[in-house]
From Swiss-Prot:
Protein name: GMP synthase [glutamine-hydrolyzing]
Species for this entry: Francisella tularensis subsp. tularensis (strain SCHU S4 / Schu 4)
Span of domain Glutamine amidotransferase type-1: 8-198
Gene3D superfamilies noted in UniProt: 3.30.300.10, 3.40.50.880, HUPs
Pathway: Purine metabolism; GMP biosynthesis; GMP from XMP (L-Gln route): step 1/1
Active site (catalytic residues): C84, H172, E174
Keywords for the protein's UniProt record, in alphabetical order: ATP-binding, Glutamine amidotransferase, GMP biosynthesis, Ligase, Nucleotide-binding, Purine biosynthesis
Complexes and interactors: Homodimer.
EC number(s) reported in the record: 6.3.5.2
Keyword Ligase: yes
GO CC annotation terms, alphabetical: cytosol
CDD domains for this protein: GATase1_GMP_Synthase, GMP_synthase_C
Length: 516
């Protein structure tokens, strides 16, 4: 079997918002890589056996900070690529000079390649469109580095060491705004570091199945199945690896999208023949949420009850030794970031449930090394439906945070119907994948309306659709007026409890994507 980790790149994180993008670009080329804090122990770097090292960008100024690349990086004899701050600290640590730029540079720029012989610019045109994001600049390269690219505002746009395979760029090749950024990454990783492109979905599936079999043996495994992307892919890979040793527990909270519980059972229990226990807990959740209006309280109640029900059912499964979870690589990085990274962590990751205290279960995380886009590709490779893998994100508490205030059965049913109409029309008009997230929100206020000659006094539904790259920021989706009119008419005519539909035109910031 191919060792997909045999050729790997080590990325040292100096706190850039783009660090995960670097890793994703390296993996897109077909090479495994991992991200670690810049101050990780020298022995760790030495023993990691990387084929090459990438130094990320960062928010600090090199001349004001004691944050440097570990000297071991430059002593191992492996190729090094410094990006933005990474280039600046590398040059400075080799006798160069970095100063604050007269003017910060953020945005697109044209660089001129001065030397493309056997370096990161091999086989590229002399003019390149790149993405700059810096306030400092290299003013002196020192005796060891030469300039291999420049721009109007950044005379030192890229450098190469005269004797060693060390390269630096002032711009960000990892962003999509840098036109041929992937080529630069590929030149470094494949041509300069000499990595074989072993990281692909076929090899990952083969490797994961072998690892799961070796780890689990004949033990039984429990998985909390939600119907979301991560748990669905975990279910599929575990089923291929260990078959009937896997039992999935699907807690139907009653707060899912219309018919979602049935769809989950159809895909996994019927089509894939996976052992799924469906727990109808709708009434328990409604009872627990009665009279509760505060969003945080609702989240806590839903989360705790979910765990309690999962624990009850898991305890009934005899000889279970493992609890599988859908932890992915960005979760791992975020969790590490709370303790180690200089990047601003927006939220920490908490897998629903975690390890129940009274259960002596070992944790199994088959997706731990994969980014979300890789998880989706893995799911396709395992035969899961495209529409399941590329659905819009859905919050853990479900419709519980899309119904403002108290949650009642009639509110849930009303929102499910309205939301389903919105989603159906997005698909029909080929708009679903043009937006990053789209959903309905139930407002517990009544508004007067007229149908025929009759006055109606019913509830309001807000439609929300946003476009976002990372969900940290978002713009409201500029959906066609004719489309919104059609959706509104359908909802008011087909959902009797609704008399008015509004469209949310708030970005993030100042708003959040979800209403609660």
């Amino acid at each position: 079997m191919t060792d997909i980790h045999n050729h790997k790149i080590l990325i040292l994180d100096f706190g850039s918002q783009y660090t995960q993008l670097i890793a994703r670009r390296v993996r897109e080329v077909g090479v495994f890589c991992e991200i670690f804090p810049h101050d990780v122990a020298a022995d760790f770097i030495k023993n990691y056996q990387a084929k090459g090292i990438i130094l990320s960008g960062g928010p600090e100024s090199v001349y004001d900070s004691d944050v440097k690349a570990p000297e071991i990086v430059f002593e191992l004899g492996v190729p090094v690529l410094g990006i933005c701050y990474g280039m600046q600290t590398m040059v400075m640590q080799h006798g160069g000079e970095v100063k604050g730029a007269d003017q910060s540079e953020f945005g697109k720029a044209i660089i001129n390649i001065l030397n493309s012989t056997n370096n990161i610019f091999s086989n590229m045109e002399h003019e390149q469109l790149v993405w700059m994001s810096h306030s400092d600049k290299v003013t002196q390269t020192g005796e060891h580095f030469e300039i291999i690219a420049s721009s109007t505002n950044a005379p030192v746009a890229a450098v190469a060491h005269k004797n060693k395979p060390f390269f630096g760029v002032q711009f960000h090749p990892e962003t999509t705004h840098t036109e041929n950024g992937k080529q630069i990454i590929e030149n470094f990783v494949v041509n300069i570091c000499g990595c074989d492109t072993l990281w692909n979905i076929e090899n990952i599936i083969e490797n994961d199945i072998k690892e799961i079999k070796q780890k689990v043996g004949t033990d039984k495994v429990i998985l909390g199945l939600s119907g979301g992307v991560d748990s669905s892919v975990v279910a599929a890979i575990l089923h291929q690896a260990i078959g009937d040793q896997l039992t999935c527990i699907f807690v139907d909270t009653g707060l899912l999208r219309l018919n979602e519980g049935d769809q989950v059972m159809q895909v996994f229990a019927e089509h894939m023949d996976i052992n799924v226990i469906r727990i109808n807990a709708k009434n328990r959740f409604l009872d627990a949420l009665r009279g509760i209006c505060d969003p945080e309280q609702k989240r806590k109640i839903i989360g705790k009850l979910f765990v309690d029900i999962f624990d009850e059912e898991a305890a009934k499964i005899e000889n279970a030794k493992w609890l599988a979870q859908g932890t992915i690589y960005s979760d791992v990085i975020e969790s590490a970031g709370n303790n180690q990274s200089k990047a601003h962590v927006i939220k920490s990751h908490h897998n629903v449930g975690g390890l129940p205290k009274e259960m002596k279960l070992k944790l199994l995380e088959p997706l731990r090394e994969l980014f979300k886009d890789e998880v989706r590709k893995l799911g396709l490779g395992l035969g899961l439906p495209y529409n399941m893998l590329y659905r819009h994100p859905f919050p853990g508490p479900g419709l519980g945070v899309r119904i403002l205030g108290e949650i009642k059965k009639e509110y849930v049913e009303t929102l499910q119907k309205a939301d389903a109409i919105f989603t159906e029309e997005l698909y029909k008009h080929n708009l679903y994948h043009d937006v990053s997230q789209a959903f309905g929100v139930f407002l517990p206020v009544k508004s007067v309306g007229v149908v025929g000659d009759q006055r109606r006094y019913e509830y309001v539904i807000a439609l929300r659709a946003v476009v976002s790259i990372d969900f940290m920021t978002a713009t409201w989706a500029n959906l066609p007026y004719d489309f919104l009119s059609l959706v509104s008419n359908r909802i008011v005519n087909e959902v009797k409890q609704v008399s008015r539909v509004v469209y949310d035109v708030t970005g993030k910031p100042p708003g959040t994507i979800e209403w609660e």
